[in-house]
Swiss-Prot record:
Induction: By ammonium supply or colonization by nitrogen-fixing bacteria in roots. Down-regulated by glutamine supply in roots. Highest expression after onset of light. This is Ammonium transporter 1 member 2. InterPro entries: Ammonium/urea_transptr, Ammonium_transpt, Ammonium_transpt_CS, NH4_transpt_AmtB-like_dom. It is found in: Membrane. Gene3D superfamilies: Ammonium transporter AmtB like domains. It comes from Solanum lycopersicum (Tomato). The keyword Transmembrane helix applies. It comes from the Eukaryota. One of its GO terms (cellular component) is plasma membrane.
């Protein structure tokens, strides 16, 4: 916020001469001046709140991107199921984040581990937080839950989605965001009392670790405990591709996520009307400029990762694959999210280039270990997110670090930028801590769901598809009466379970023209 302007009648009076009305004139001028100053202050709050709300809307729109990406990446027989789980992530996550999540994350005053106030938004808004901030943070929380849903797609019971989504957004994710983003967190770069990890905290500006690693590691445990989908690996252990049914939806979802990322990364500044030191660059330069730079670094990282994936996969598999390119693009975005505000544009290109190789490498490792993740979510968000945190410890620029995190003139910065290895050490600790925390919380949860037979659907249901067996029908309309139609198209075969006794679910297959 801009500093308030002040006016004193006692200071102004000597400048008005010795007229009889000088005192009254000074008081009148100062009263008008105070009114204008208050108006400007209110305008600043309004502009900053509007900026934050707009960013929240962009981040929330990423849920549509996740939904389209997930729908296109699964087989047609599970489309309705995965779409419903994405709606559930937002709805259940909103309720749990309102009751507990926001309080655990930002309920100040608190200790370094967990927040203690604002349960159910009680005593809200406060001087520190407004409702717009809650909305923005909720959008981040459900993004983490959406990442996890992709890892366990096509084989997970609906009740398991409800349980894990509420637990992740209401407890697991908020604790991590408290550690690294709250003003009281033990590793937060925004903490002011100096009682920090290595005395300066970690830099995870928009959440390569807080959001992407949390969602990715949670998905890793879910997919690992469930096991691969039926048919994903043959009897000899070789990988069998279970292609998603719509590359068009994958591309649509990717572009929606790309658009939303401009609220995710630049929006994490929270305010836009903030001046920087004018002696360095002049009055034209302020937080609005840093926001623009953040959008540029985000763009370059994603574009570089997409192009790198395109040509690398062409060399590896001898064809151009749009789905691989989309995943590479998103991997670049996940990686740059940590350091987007504190690195140069050229460094973002380095980030995206290596992120593409990280994703390719983790995908190869997953296939070798017979790990099945339909959306590559654990590899993309967990793997590339981890690289993004390390990248920040290598390439964070001193000037930008001091702009984004003022008040600590001797704060360490990137190793390759001359800042030594302290920040890199803190970033490595963040990676280890997030992996540990999510593993000891989400791992046991998925294991308990598995033991109580609440995690994976039956083999027959999985073979037939959950749209038919769990959700009352297909996501796409099948017109049996059009079977003999001369309309151009291709035939799809509907397969239903063989062990049901109802007349409507007897074993049959119907060829339908689409």
């Amino acid at each position: 916020m801009a500093s308030a302007m002040t006016c004193s009648a006692a200071e102004l009076f000597p400048h008005l001469g010795s007229s009889a009305n000088a005192t009254a004139a000074a008081e009148f001028i100062c009263s008008r001046f105070s009114a204008v100053s208050e108006y400007l202050t209110n305008t600043t709050y309004a502009v900053d709140t509007t900026y934050l709300l707009f960013s929240a809307y962009l981040v929330f729109a990423m849920q549509l991107g996740f939904a389209m990406l997930c729908a296109g990446s699964v087989r047609a027989k599970n489309t309705m199921n995965i779409m419903l789980t994405n709606v559930l992530d937002a709805a259940a996550g909103g309720f749990s984040y309102y009751l507990f999540g926001f309080a655990f994350a930002f309920g100040a005053p608190s200790n370094g581990f967990i927040g203690k106030h604002f349960f159910g938004l009680k005593e809200f808004p406060s001087q520190a937080f407004d409702y717009s901030y809650f909305l923005y943070q909720w959008a981040f929380a459900i993004a983490a839950a959406g990442i996890t849903s992709g890892s366990i797609a096509e084989r997970t019971q609906f009740v398991a989605y409800l349980i894990y989504s509420s637990f992740l957004t209401g407890f697991v994710y908020p604790i991590v965001s408290h550690w690294f983003w709250s003003g009281d967190g033990w590793a937060s770069a925004s903490k002011t009392d100096g009682n920090l990890l290595l005395r300066f905290g970690v830099i995870d500006f928009a959440g390569s670790g807080v959001v992407h690693m949390v969602g990715g590691i949670a998905g890793l445990w879910g997919a690992f405990i469930e096991g691969p989908r039926i048919g994903r690996f043959d009897r000899s252990g070789r990988s069998v591709a279970l292609r998603g049914h719509s590359a068009s939806l994958v591309v649509l979802g990717t572009f929606l996520l790309w658009f939303g990322w401009y609220g995710f990364n630049p929006g994490s500044f929270l305010t836009i009307l903030k001046s920087y030191d004018h002696t360095i660059r002049g009055t034209y330069y302020g937080q609005w400029s840093a926001i623009g730079r953040t959008a540029v670094t985000t763009t370059l990282a994603g574009c570089t990762a997409a192009l790198t994936t395109l040509f690398c996969k062409r060399l590896l598999v001898a064809h151009w694959n749009v789905v691989d390119v989309c995943n590479g693009l998103l991997g670049g975005f996940a990686a740059i999210t940590s350091g987007c505000a504190v690195v140069e544009p050229w460094a973002a290109i380095v980030c995206g280039f290596i992120a593409a190789w990280v994703l390719i490498g983790f995908n190869a490792l997953a296939a070798k270990l017979k790990y099945d993740d339909p959306l590559e979510a654990a590899q993309l968000h967990g793997g590339c997110g981890s690289w993004g945190i390390i990248f920040t410890g290598l390439f964070a620029k001193k000037e930008y670090v001091n702009e984004v995190y003022p008040g600590f003139p001797n704060r360490p910065y990137g190793l390759f930028m001359g800042g030594g290895g302290k920040l890199l050490g803190a970033q490595v600790i963040q990676v280890v801590v997030i992996i540990g925390w999510v593993s000891v919380t989400m791992g046991p949860l998925f294991y308990l769901l598995h033991k109580f037979k609440l995690l994976r659907i039956s083999r027959d249901d999985e073979t037939a598809g959950m749209d038919l067996t769990r959700h009352g029908g297909f996501a796409y309309i099948y017109h049996d009466e059009d079977e003999g139609s001369s309309m151009p198209g291709f035939k799809m075969t509907r397969v239903e379970p063989t062990n049901t006794s109802t007349p409507d679910h007897q074993n049959r297959s119907v060829n339908v023209v689409v």
